[in-house]
Swiss-Prot record:
InterPro entries: Eph_TM, EphA7_rcpt_lig-bd, Ephrin_rcpt_lig-bd_dom, Ephrin_rcpt_TKs, FN3_dom, FN3_sf, Galactose-bd-like_sf, Growth_fac_rcpt_cys_sf. Belongs to the protein kinase superfamily. Tyr protein kinase family. Ephrin receptor subfamily. The chain crosses the membrane at residues 556-576. It is found in: Cell membrane. This is Ephrin type-A receptor 7. Residues 32-210 form the Eph LBD domain. The modification Phosphotyrosine is found at Y608, Y614, Y791, Y940. Residues 28-555 are extracellular. It comes from Rattus norvegicus. The gene is Epha7. Coiled coil: none annotated.
Length: 998
């Protein structure tokens, strides 16, 4: 039997007693769950010691003089020590990862004499995992070593004397664990050691409320780096945010990390701390997305807590489309100051807004028309035969025109202001009313049209007077056209009787005839269509019959021939006079094989009527233009001068209507009759147009002096000057929008059969909203002061730079030639009002165009827009796009702005920019300095040299950004240099055989 020698236990016990006075106990961290704490047990621990003579349990005191149980061992005199100490079975609960905290003291072996070969300063920590208590037997081979524990500090005999306390604390972790519990074991191999305390615990994240979500107690994961995701539960009266459920992650250290998502208080509740409290009375919250409760809007209330919306007060309403936060509103009061103006069977109504709009901004107006019998005092709705301009309901403006009323009838009109809650109100309607009696109306439809006689080249017709002439019929108008040519043109004939013979028809052709009557009140509706086929060409038998007749009565034949010859001569003279008379330009130049009164497109399109067809020009003016009282016009200032007189700005105030800003063209004093006719001719043309992109004619003054034409006022003036004034200030989309408006106006004119002939940016006017409108409908005046602006040919002056080649050479003006001019306008707009072809002479322009050269793309012009310009400049007019197609192309560009970012050079087919004799041959220059001197930009020579542009080849590759990077800040100089670079690049391509003419 080996007797083990140990140092006296009082040495260690004394040290432990000293520790009790020096050590302050640590409070248990809230995230730790204790499984074992030896300090908390005041009775004997009764752990298993093997051998029994090894570890021994002793008592001590803590800082509060509370007894604590410790184990010590100090068998340092003998070698090969193997002393085991095992705890009782420890249940792990829900833990997967366990922490063991050891507090111990250890004697310095050097302070003990005679033990250098046997004394150790470490011990081993083990554990054994099991589902139940296995008894008191320690089976060492089943234990798994956790670690070898060494002291950071060991104590000596001197430390005891000096009361120096050296307590070591070590923490080790175990896991992951899979069984219900485990044992801890401590192996001494020859150290002098005392286990002051053993604490076993695991960590978990304690329950918290975060973002209005409750997260329960959660045990940490099995690995040090693991995060356990936990889904929260919303507190009372809260709900999960859409597609953003509340989640948090429990870390291995027992801390909540990475909050994701949240809960939000339901409608009617707001957050207060970690709870949702109901909205108070007179408050509401309509959506869980709102943060706080809001006070009820005006004229609404809530009489309970937790309201999600407020109810409207009596007499107030909320429209279905109104959000809950807007005030309750009511229907508007009646419109004010209702006035009317009667023009035969048309009534214009105008009024002022209601004094009370009910608190809403969506006030519109609706009109109720009643036809009344004064004798019986009864009124009935007018029915669907009445027309309203612009509409009967949903009116945003405070005026309306009611048309197609019966003549000499009594009507009552009620004008009601309505808003979004008018239909919800049960109150009586509020409206303004006016009663009127109509005057004379246009005649009703002509009836009973019959063909009396049909020959090869003539047709005789007869008809009955209208059932309701509504006045004295002064003439009838017969409209006729070839049935298979109805898409092109028609002709008219006027007569004062109820029969007529229409001559100069084609044999064997079907014609369509319609007739309408005219009174002082205007034209009535056309009669139903009557189709008549002329006879075929005469056969041989008819010639024989004619010969026999001539033999029988030669005197009659001679007389007939003489009369016929006289009539033909008269018609030739008359036709010559008509052909020579013109309004701004000769209609003989208009394309077509016949001299026709009208050019008309079917179906349903309003037709342009040439004022030349009127024997009396005054009649054309009064048919298409409203005669104004000069007293209604106030001239304020002169804004320009034209060929016929001054152009002024002023105001037009018609009775019962608002005054509007207008532009006034005046006819100068001492005018000739021809000048007066030409002056009013433009009004006769403008009066036929009604389109938002065509300048609107307000009326004319012909019965006083000065003679005036009054048109709408366009605040920004001519487009070319406007663009030059605002150079570089618009986006590409804005410029394309302007071009789209011009194209829409030209499409309207083309559909009416009107050819403009002088489409240019100077003849486009711009209003305050940047709406562009086509103007200038007379070509008789000088186009510009510059004599080079026009090229004189037989028959008049032509604006060469804007005119199609066939119009210059053959005077063939068509909608296709207007398309060419529109392409030039596009170039003007994209270049901010630059002069087309710059300083080239007109002869050089004509020559360059004939050779196939076209204007290059302006700076920063998208390739798609330049391609459209080139399409408009096709030599063959049939290959040019129609205005309808141009509008469609521009609409697509506006709907797809990315298409306007296409860089130049990506066109569908190669092009060659303008090259002509007046353009310098940039390829002949030897240096960049010579080139700059040629374009008068030599001041920037040093800029180019400093940036490394020493060859023309490198210059030809420059972009606008490169030019700007040289410090060239003047926009005009940037444009001039870039234009020259583009031309240089084109010449280089042309020199190498890659340039292709259009």
């Amino acid at each position: 039997m080996v007797v083990q020698t140990r140092y006296p236990s009082w040495i260690i016990l004394c040290y432990i007693w000293l520790l009790g006075f020096a050590h302050t106990g640590e409070a248990q961290a809230a995230k730790e769950v204790l499984l074992l704490d030896s300090k908390a047990q005041q009775t004997e621990l009764e752990w298993i010691s093997s051998p029994p003579s090894g570890w021994e349990e002793i008592s001590g005191l803590d800082e509060n003089y509370t007894p604590i149980r410790t184990y010590q061992v100090c068998q340092v005199m003998e070698p090969n020590q193997n002393n085991w100490l095992r705890t009782n079975w420890i249940s792990k609960g829900n833990a997967q990862r366990i922490f063991v905290e050891l507090k111990f003291t250890l004697r310095d072996c050097n302070s003990l004499p005679g033990v250098l070969g046997t004394c150790k300063e470490t011990f081993n920590l083990y554990y054994y995992e099991t589902d139940y208590d296995t008894g008191r037997n320690i089976r060492e081979n089943l234990y798994v070593k956790i670690d070898t524990i060494a002291a950071d500090e060991s104590f000596t005999q001197g430390d005891l004397g000096e009361r120096k306390m050296k307590l070591n604390t070590e923490v080790r972790e175990i896991g992951p664990l899979s069984k219900k519990g485990f044992y801890l074991a401590f192996q001494d191999v020859g150290a002098c050691i005392a286990l002051v305390s053993v604490k076993v615990y695991y960590k978990k994240c304690w329950s918290i409320i975060e973002n209005l979500a409750v997260f329960p107690d959660t045990v940490t994961g099995s690995e040090f780096s693991s995060l356990v995701e936990v889904r929260g539960t919303c507190v009372s009266s809260a709900e999960e945010e859409a597609e953003n459920s509340p989640r948090m992650h429990c870390s291995a250290e027992g801390e909540w990390l990475v909050p994701i998502g949240k809960c939000i208080c339901k409608a009617g509740y707001q957050q207060k701390g970690d709870t949702c409290e109901p909205c108070g009375r007179r408050f509401y919250k309509s959506s869980s997305q709102d943060l706080q409760c809001s006070r009820c809007p005006t004229h609404s209330f809530s009489d309970r807590e937790g309201s999600s919306r407020c109810e409207c007060e009596d007499g107030y309403y909320r429209a279905p489309s109104d959000p809950p936060y807007v005030a309750c509103t009511r229907p508007p009061s009646a419109p004010q100051n209702l006035i009317f103006n009667i023009n035969q069977t048309t009534v214009s109504l105008e009024w002022s807004p209601p004094a009370d709009n009910g608190g809403r901004n969506d006030v519109t107006y609706r009109i109720l028309c009643k036809r009344c019998s004064w004798e019986q005092g009864e009124c009935v709705p007018c029915g669907s035969n009445i027309g309203y301009m612009p509409q009967q309901t949903g009116l945003e403006d405070n005026y309306v025109t009611v048309m197609d009323l019966l003549a000499h009838a009594n009507y009552t009109f009620e004008v009601e202001a309505v808003n979004g809650v008018s239909d919800l109100s049960r109150s009586q309607r509020l409206f303004a009313a006016v009663s009127i009696t109509t005057g004379q109306a246009a005649p009703s439809q002509v009836s009973g049209v019959m063909k009396e006689r049909v020959l090869q080249r003539s047709v005789e017709l007869s008809w009955q007077e209208p059932e309701h002439p509504n006045g004295v019929i002064t003439e009838y108008e017969i409209k006729y056209y070839e049935k298979d040519q109805r898409e092109r043109t028609y002709s008219t004939l006027k007569t004062k009787s109820t029969s007529a013979s229409i001559n100069n028809l084609k044999p064997g052709t079907v014609y369509v005839f319609q007739i309408r009557a005219f009174t002082a009140a205007g034209y009535g509706n056309y009669s139903p269509r009557l189709d008549v086929a002329t006879l075929e060409e005469a056969s041989g038998k008819m010639f024989e019959a004619t010969a026999v007749s001539s033999e029988q009565n030669p005197v009659i034949i001679i007389a007939v021939v003489a009369v016929a010859g006289t009539i033909i001569l008269v018609f030739m003279v008359f036709g010559f006079i008509i052909g020579r008379r013109h309004c701004g330009y000769s209609k003989a130049d208009q394309e077509g094989d016949e001299e026709l009164y009208f050019h008309f497109k079917f179906p349903g399109t309003k037709t342009y009527i040439d004022p030349e067809t009127y024997e009396d020009p005054n009649r054309a003016v009064h048919q298409f233009a409203k005669e104004l009282d000069a007293s209604c016009i106030k001239i304020e200032r002169v804004i320009g001068a034209g060929e016929f007189g001054e152009v002024c700005s002023g105001r037009l105030k018609l009775p019962g209507k608002r005054d509007v800003a207008v532009a006034i063209k005046t006819l100068k004093v001492g005018y000739t009759e021809k000048q007066r006719r030409d002056f009013l001719c433009e009004a006769s043309i403008m009066g036929q147009f009604d389109h938002p992109n065509v300048v609107h004619l307000e009326g004319v003054v012909t019965r006083g002096k000065p003679v005036m034409i009054v048109i709408e006022f366009m605040e920004n003036g001519a487009l070319d000057a406007f663009l030059r004034k605002h150079d570089g200030q618009f986006t590409v989309i804005q410029l394309v929008g302007m071009l789209r408006g011009i194209a829409a106006g030209m499409r309207y004119l083309a559909d009416m059969g009107y050819v403009h002939r002088d489409l240019a940016a100077r003849n486009i006017l711009v209003n305050s909203n940047l709406v562009c409108k086509v103007s200038d409908f007379g070509l008789s005046r000088v186009i510009e002061d510059d004599p080079e602006a026009v090229y004189t040919t037989t028959g008049g002056k032509i604006p060469v730079r804007w005119t199609a080649p066939e119009a210059i050479q053959y005077r063939k003006f068509t909608s296709a030639s207007d398309v060419w001019s529109y392409g030039i306008v596009m170039w003007e707009v994209m270049s901010y009002g630059e002069r087309p072809y710059w300083d080239m002479s007109n002869q050089d322009v004509i020559k360059a165009i004939e050779e196939g050269y076209r204007l290059p793309a302006p700076m920063d012009c998208p390739a798609g827009l330049h391609q459209l310009m080139l399409d408009c400049w096709q030599k063959e007019r049939a290959e040019r796009p129609k205005f309808e197609q141009i509008v469609g192309i521009l609409d697509k560009m506006i709907r797809n702005p990315s298409s306007l970012k296409t860089p130049l050079g990506t066109c569908s087919r190669p092009i060659s920019p303008l090259l002509d004799q007046s353009t310098p041959d940039f390829t002949a220059f030897c240096s960049v300095g010579e080139w700059l001197q040629a374009i008068k930009m030599e001041r920037y020579k040093d800029n180019f040299t400093a940036a490394g542009y020493n060859s023309l080849e490198s210059v030809a590759r420059m972009t606008i950004d490169d030019v700007m990077s040289l410090g060239i800040t003047l926009v005009g100089h940037q444009k001039k240099i870039m234009s020259s670079i583009q031309t240089m690049r084109a010449q280089m391509l042309h020199l190498h055989g890659t340039g292709i003419q259009v």
